[in-house]
Amino acid sequence: MKYSTTKIPPAKMNSSADKALVKSPKLRKSQQKPEGVCQMYFMQLRSGLIIEKTSCYFRKEITKRYSPRTAEKCRKQCLVFTACHQQLNKDFTSDVPMLQKCFGRANVPSIQEYSASLSTYNDQSITFVFEDGSYEIYVEDLRKGQEKDKVLFRYYDSQSPSHETGDDVDGQTLLVNLSPTKDKDFLLHANNEEHSVELQKCENQLPDQAFFLLHRKSSECVSFECKNNPGVFIGVKDNHLALIKVGDQTKDSYIEKTIFKLS
């Protein structure tokens, strides 16, 4: 029995193979840039613990050119947004109370003063208006050309360590009181009976209602917890400052109502 085989010349074989291949368009070397990519995965357990996993690899990507000003603006916005939201989500999902802290004396030496503009998480400004011998506090959008009011922060030493909550932001918690920079004798007070925040004149002894625990969520995001009422924060309600109990809020509502920005 005979068998016949058909031999295909190598040149023809290569030619046939080439026809089956689809060549992708080549990019100029100037358009290709090796880029390190890191992906972060998070898994939250029922206990509130968040497990993090990171995987990194390199890829080539067509470069996109931005002006230095645009690139820097995008970078800052991304950093603030990411840092703020990661810490906020961590605080909110914790089953442990956000802060439990003990203090000795109500009046302790001031260690630092800092002046800054205060705005809400939605970029509305906090303004102080003096009317009929007292101040009114408003949360509003600024008119064109209107300057932001400045708030004077006085930082105090707590004299005793904070309660361990498993939240690393506790190590950055400070005791503060707040007043308009143009009238330092008036301080923010927490009115627990009316669930409101008021500016009252203080000359000598400062009551506990005038002290708040400053939680640093990021370089720009902060929140203010009542010293004498743990779990209750300065927040925004009906375009005014009010006292908000975090346990009664959803996560999104908590972020929008109790987080403030410094600038």
From Swiss-Prot:
Site note Cleavage, residues: 103-104
CDD domains for this protein: beta-trefoil_IL33
Subcellular localization: Nucleus; Chromosome; Cytoplasm; Cytoplasmic vesicle, Secretory vesicle
Superkingdom of the source species: Eukaryota
Positions of disulphide bridges: none
GO molecular-function term, one example from the UniProt record: cytokine activity
Residues covered by region (Disordered): 1-28
Region (Homeodomain-like HTH domain): 1-65
One GO term describing the cellular component: chromosome
Keyword rRNA-binding among record annotations: no
Compositional bias segments (type: Polar residues): 1-17
Tissue expression: Expressed in cultured umbilical artery smooth muscle cells after stimulation with IL1A and IL1B, and to a lesser extent with IFNG. Expressed in vasospastic cerebral arteries after subarachnoid hemorrhage.
Keywords in alphabetical order: Chromosome, Cytokine, Cytoplasm, Cytoplasmic vesicle, Nucleus, Secreted, Transcription
Gene3D superfamilies named among the record's database cross-references: 2.80.10.50
One GO BP annotation of this record: positive regulation of inflammatory response
Listed InterPro entries: IL-33, IL33_C
Modification comment: The full-length protein can be released from cells and is able to signal via the IL1RL1/ST2 receptor. However, proteolytic processing by CELA1, CSTG/cathepsin G and ELANE/neutrophil elastase produces C-terminal peptides that are more active than the unprocessed full-length protein. May also be proteolytically processed by calpains. Proteolytic cleavage mediated by apoptotic caspases including CASP3 and CASP7 results in IL33 inactivation.
Span list, region Interaction with RELA: 62-103
Function: Cytokine that binds to and signals through the IL1RL1/ST2 receptor which in turn activates NF-kappa-B and MAPK signaling pathways in target cells. Involved in the maturation of Th2 cells inducing the secretion of T-helper type 2-associated cytokines. Also involved in activation of mast cells, basophils, eosinophils and natural killer cells. Acts as a chemoattractant for Th2 cells, and may function as an 'alarmin', that amplifies immune responses during tissue injury.
Family recorded in the similarity comment: Belongs to the IL-1 family. Highly divergent.
Subunit structure: Forms a 1:1:1 heterotrimeric complex with its primary high-affinity receptor IL1RL1 and the coreceptor IL1RAP. Interacts with cargo receptor TMED10; the interaction mediates the translocation from the cytoplasm into the ERGIC (endoplasmic reticulum-Golgi intermediate compartment) and thereby secretion.
Domain topic, free-text comment: The homeodomain-like HTH domain mediates nuclear localization and heterochromatin association.
Protein known as: Interleukin-33
Species name: Canis lupus familiaris
Encoding gene, per UniProt annotation: IL33
